[in-house]
Amino acid sequence: MNKIIKGDRVVVIAGKDKGKQGQVVRVLGGKVVVEGVNVVKRHQKPNPMRGIKGGIITKEMPLDISNIAILNPETNKADRVGIKLIENEGKVKRVRFFKSNGSIIGA
């Protein structure tokens, strides 16, 4: 289980976009794409077969997962994430929790 998944609210803790907040759009192994963060301009060649117009486009590039931290909604600060096992009706389930206060993420 990954500590950061799609849909999490995160804050950038290192790099040129330090302090910016956003929502995780994609997780790519050790990298994540965050909405509105690490935006770059790229030159796009036109491709009429695919219906792609040419020009300069802006797109979000991946950030290393070590440069972001999940945002705790209770404290509105960056927090560390842990994983613990919870037993419910004989089934063991892995859940993520905030290390600062122990509250379960997404519950």
Swiss-Prot record:
Keywords: Ribonucleoprotein, Ribosomal protein, RNA-binding, rRNA-binding
Domain of life: Bacteria
Stored SUPFAM superfamilies: Translation proteins SH3-like domain (SSF50104)
Pfam families attached to this UniProt entry: KOW (PF00467), ribosomal_L24 (PF17136)
GO molecular function, one term: structural constituent of ribosome
Entry's Gene Ontology BP terms: translation
Gene3D superfamilies xref list: 2.30.30.30
A cellular-component GO term for this protein: ribonucleoprotein complex
Function in brief: One of two assembly initiator proteins, it binds directly to the 5'-end of the 23S rRNA, where it nucleates assembly of the 50S subunit. One of the proteins that surrounds the polypeptide exit tunnel on the outside of the subunit.
UniProt xrefs under PANTHER family: MITOCHONDRIAL RIBOSOMAL PROTEIN L24
Protein family membership: Belongs to the universal ribosomal protein uL24 family.
Subunit text: Part of the 50S ribosomal subunit.
Protein name in UniProt: Large ribosomal subunit protein uL24
Source organism (scientific name): Neisseria gonorrhoeae (strain ATCC 700825 / FA 1090)
Native organism taxonomy: Bacteria, Pseudomonadati, Pseudomonadota, Betaproteobacteria, Neisseriales
Gene: rplX
